[in-house]
Amino acid sequence: MVEYTAEFTAEEQALIDKEFARLGESTYLDHAGTTLYAESQVLSAAQQLQRDVICNPHTCRATGDYVDQVRYRILEFFNTNADDYHVVFTANATAALRLVADHFDFAGDGNFHYCQENHTSVLGMRQLVKAKGIYMLTKDDIELNVLDQPSTPAPAAAATAQANSLVTFSAQCNFSGYKMPLTVIEQIQKRGLQQLGKCIWSAESQPAAKNVDSNYYVCLDAAAFAASSPLDLQRFRPDFVCVSFYKIFGYPTGVGGLLVSRRGAEVLRKRFYGGGTINYAYPHTMEHQLRNVFHERFEDGTLPFLSIVELLQGFRTLERLVPGRSIERISRHVHGLARYCEHQLKQLKHPNGAPLITLYNHAGYEDRAKQGGTVAFNVRTNTGDYVGFGEVACMAALHRILLRTGCFCNVGACQHFLQLNDETMDAIYKRAGRICGDYFDLLDGQPTGAVRVSFGYMTRIQDVDRFLQMLRNSYLVIAKPQQRFSFIEQQAELLPKALQQRAQRLRPRLLQLAIYPVKSCAAFKIDSSTGSWPLTKQGLQYDREWMIVDMNGMALTQKRCTDLCLIQPRIVGDQLELHYAETSCSMPLSLSVQAANSARCHSKVCRQAIEGYDCGDEVATWLSQSLGLEGVRLLRQSAQRSAPGTQQQQLSLVNQAQFLLVNRASVRSLQFEESLDETVDRFRANIIIDTGTPFEELTYTQLRIGDILFQVDGPCQRCDMICINQRTGERSPETLTTIARMQSGKMRFGIYISRLPSETDDRLEQQQQLTCGDVIVVS
């Protein structure tokens, strides 16, 4: 059993708690986003502003002295000095990365390399760098360069190399909290890369496949790392270090820094200049001269001098609240909390033994050198299905717990840990329309992001326990999704505005309608792009209103002719079009037009006699040629038909009920190699929903879709028709055998439902419709 060992004394903890008493009943667990500022810190900053006259450093030398004092404190914080590193103030860590991208001199033939698991700001550098090639490195590619790694050594970078290459990676991943071994820095600088990585772009038709003749420079994104881990620049000497001070102190925002080594300074070529970055410039010629002092050359315009001066209070507060090697102690504290949290999450299990949590990390939580104070995960149901991170965010918010969800601006780590291939990424961002920062959390049941908790020096063990209890209460005690949805909906007004919209989307919704105008042929689909479809007393308008019969007048089905699934009906305007391969035919939708020009015929559907109109020789000839069958005809139902045993439920040419409903979550549980859409098509349902929980639909007795109430008539008993791939006509037995295995020998999949009559049916029948996106309420 992993226990948390307190890092702070009782007196220290009491002092820290007093500084953050404003949290009250709230629990703050997003220190990777920003840590919190202490009360005395901002009071001291305000007192200094009241006491001192701090004006533009171009005007007042005293302000410049304050700023220089802050530079000294920053260098001291990272255990270095002004002889080895320059401090350039920027707006934030992103601006520091941009500064490097803008000004790094690749000397023609150098390459830009970046780690896959990086903040999007590093991806943005690709748009600016003037490199010969751009390469993506995985975490493992970078770790091949660890000093004690037994591998074939890369040739040392030539002393006479003319090109300069830049390697950028995070000291700590802001998604998972994994810490990169910093010993790779010196190895890369001296010997280049063992692996160049995957070429993303190249100016050459044949990009380099091995280490090139180049000087190698390292840019370290330390924004997440420096907030709670000591970065010793005497021991590890990256050429560029990007930091964000609000992540360390909580206040002020709007100021970051770029630490540049003497070596790194030699390859930054300043082009733009502004404000106090020059000794002189002539307006009538191009002549100008940059400042001699390095940081003065790169700090364009007036610095945010008030914010910079307030950093002094941040350093002082940290040293006062966590005395004696502050950042080292903070590192031990947050790692201990993360280790405890991760262990407790592993213990959370459903009654059937299934784990509640899937964790995302590379190396576990035993080694502080490899893992920071961050835990990323997703919640799962007792059947192994994922709970959307948006729902978890809502539950946390209602328990007054602040945490982070999504991809955390680290889409590369998201792609790696969630195992999203490029095709899935396209489906998420291009087809489904997800954007960074939204609450689009599941696509076909698979997560598009995660939940993250991260800890700071003011985080207490009680905060972690409260978070863990929230998960237990929400997902182990309240196991049914409908109960959770009701809990969230009842308190939705208490949620932040960004989450209120997500709360409205928790209930399952109607995803798709499928109309089968011609019995046993392909579906005509209605989804969110096409909107709504009318209802009649028999079901969806035009559903199974036509059928193909053989020369004996018997209904033709896919059991006898699998090619029927390749006939694609389309309803276009006032016409029904039938398409097969490259050919097509059409006929009017109007029943009166068809009846006036057609002969009456009789056939049977499921042993019931039906009456219809023959649709004529033209379509019959087309069907015969398409299917390769003689004597086939197309009939259209002409009279109402009732379900067996009832005079109330009117049917089209369906086998048993007005509607067949299938849950995509249930289909996903079958886990076939074909696409989910292909498997859904096998079941030939009219109404497709996605509850997130497999086979939940089998427990329904009634449901309301939009404003329309339905009753459940029972489960659909399946036959070998579902073995036919509806896109190819090929047969395979896996679908039926899998269902039989999962349902203990029962061939049930999907449910039959019928619309309950209402007082307005006769008056408003033409206005009754189902709309994709309608909320589904189960009773």
From Swiss-Prot:
The active site is at 409. GO terms for biological process: Mo-molybdopterin cofactor biosynthetic process; molybdopterin cofactor metabolic process. GO terms for molecular function: lyase activity; molybdenum cofactor sulfurtransferase activity; molybdenum ion binding; pyridoxal phosphate binding. The keyword Chaperone does not apply. It comes from the Eukaryota. Pfam families: Aminotran_5 (PF00266), MOSC (PF03473), MOSC_N (PF03476). Residues 624-779 form the MOSC domain. It catalyses: Mo-molybdopterin + L-cysteine + AH2 = thio-Mo-molybdopterin + L-alanine + A + H2O. Pathway: Cofactor biosynthesis; molybdopterin biosynthesis. PROSITE patterns: MOSC. The modification Phosphoserine is found at residue 732. Keywords: Molybdenum cofactor biosynthesis, Phosphoprotein, Pyridoxal phosphate, Transferase. The modification N6-(pyridoxal phosphate)lysine is found at residue 247. Its cofactor is pyridoxal 5'-phosphate. The keyword Transferase applies. SUPFAM superfamilies: MOSC N-terminal domain-like, PK beta-barrel domain-like, PLP-dependent transferases. Its EC number is 2.8.1.9. Belongs to the class-V pyridoxal-phosphate-dependent aminotransferase family. MOCOS subfamily. Sulfurates the molybdenum cofactor. Sulfation of molybdenum is essential for xanthine dehydrogenase (XDH) and aldehyde oxidase (ADO) enzymes in which molybdenum cofactor is liganded by 1 oxygen and 1 sulfur atom in active form. This is Molybdenum cofactor sulfurase. It comes from Drosophila mojavensis.
